[in-house]
Amino acid sequence: MCGIIGYTGSENVKDVLLDALELLEYRGYDSAGIAVKDETSHVTNVYKCAGRVSDLRAICDSKKILSTCGIGHTRWATHGGVTDQNAHPHQQGKVTLVHNGIIENYRELIADYDLQEILHSETDSEVAAALLNHYYKGDPKEAIKKTVSKLKGTFALVILFEDQPDVIYSIRNVSPIVATICKEGAMLASDLTALCRFTNEYFVVPEYHILELHKDHVVLTDLNDNVVEPEFLSVDWELNSAGKNGYPFYMEKEIMEQPEAIKNTIKDRIVNGLPDFTSDGVPDSLFTDCDRICVVACGTAMHAGLVAQALVKSIVHVQMDVELASEFMYSNPVIDEKTLVIAVSQSGETIDTLEALKYAKRQGAKCLSVINVKGSSIARESDYVLYTAAGPEIAVASTKAYTTQLSVFYLVVAKMALLRGVYTEEQTKSFIAELERVPEVMQKVLEKRRDIHVIAKKILEAKDLFMIGRGLDYSILLEGSLKLKEVSYIHSEAYASGELKHGPIALITTNTPVVATVTQEKLMSKELSNIKEVKSRGADIVLFIKEALSGDLDTEYQVIKLPDMQDEFMVLPASVALQLLAYYVSSDKGFDVDKPRNLAKVVTVE
């Protein structure tokens, strides 16, 4: 849950590192630091502080830093408080190091190597630096090999040695590292986002391989000193796609990018009006040979799975379960070779989802993943991958990753319905044609953003807010509620409307905001009755309703009419409306929308 960057080349390293760290802040932003090699003396100088990258930039701008080689880190505290001393990089003797992960046996290492007196921080990371310095006798690789043989846990280590000018070393276990070589030099990072300003080509550093970054080349070796050729991947992200492009926050930019992201996600998977995964290498048998499906995911990705579950069960009539990845292994799930396990993750690095996937494979399940980053850990662990085309998503609160995940699931539902004989070819084409309308309909929702902003202003002071809906509406409100609590810090809960009388209605008092969605015609009458019920208890109603269903509504409701689609697809335009609501509440409250307190985007520690 930390951000890492390393660079050696021809550019001013200070600017490269700080710019990259700003792009990596969503991985953690309670402290930041850089270490740079002085151009003449080759001494490694460290600049770090508790606080944001902007605080670090202010410190660095006050110094004369002349260097073209260095490493950087944004921290999300797991061991030790948020202090200058606990910020990375850590220095011990000739070693300067940044680390992502958790070293589980750090206390034992402190005792075994009598390190207590030389440590300056409370972190497990500095223990790794001290151990490296203990073993370093002039051969960096030998010191690295001896050190990692003693470590238990997860780690991505990026290292500078005092007497190795302009060279950066790295090794990892579980925690991700990607790297590249480009005309400006050689780079590595914990996330592809930090590299895409320079190149679209990169490679994933394999576990327990030592990477050397030199100014004009890289060397990758295994622990037996065999040279390994990096396997370069390409990504079609624009080189400037990780910027805000004039928007005040990444979240707003990413909401606005959704029509194009969905178009890019589905366009190459529709052939002659039918779903086609040939280009993904996914065989039809994957969807016909399974008796049941299990989605494993966390947070927003799990909510995408809940929508998929409702669609698969109602349309394809196949049993589908959705499991929290963090609980999956402990629940003794019923998994066998006839189970299709689908892992969903924006980053492809979510540690709980990765571990759940590994467990499912050990039980013999076929594994498909829906992710946004090529070459990520979950992609490499999966039998098959369906990539979304969301592009870089920087805001901690996910928006376009969620809706592109949904668009992939719609394709999967159509494919399964066709292959299993539930849909004829013509019915499948009709379903796909409606999916192709989604970008246009989403754009119409985005054009209503001023109306949604007006409603957002009316709930700024709310301490509690409830969301109610039935069927697919309930599934999307779980995500809408999560978005609101993530970025606005309003206590928000989503309930299935039929459960109101089983407890939640006791919380409704005068002026309690209640957000409802009505997009499913067959459930409309029951849902409107539930809305009237909470209205009679004094609730203030915000209603997002499919335009064709709007008819005669209570004039006291605050209503946003959503452009019409077939009921099964209303999830997508309604999701955008709920994202906008959360965004405007947060921005109007003056919060940092992109970096909600206590949250990091990529969870890489259990």
Segments (PLM) and residue ranges:
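Conserved short alpha-helical segments that host acidic/polar catalytic motifs at enzyme active sites
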Residues: 1-244, 248-249, 260-267, 271-291, ...
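Glycine-rich oxoanion-binding loops at beta->alpha junctions
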Residues: 68-85, 271-284, 308-344, 491-507
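Structural motif
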Residues: 69, 95, 292-294, 340, ...
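Active-site phosphate/pyrophosphate-binding segments
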Residues: 258-262, 266-294, 384-513, 587-606
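Glycine-rich phosphate-binding loops that contact phosphosugars or nucleotide phosphates
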Residues: 288-437, 470, 517-563, 581, ...
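Generic C-terminus detector
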Residues: 555, 565-606
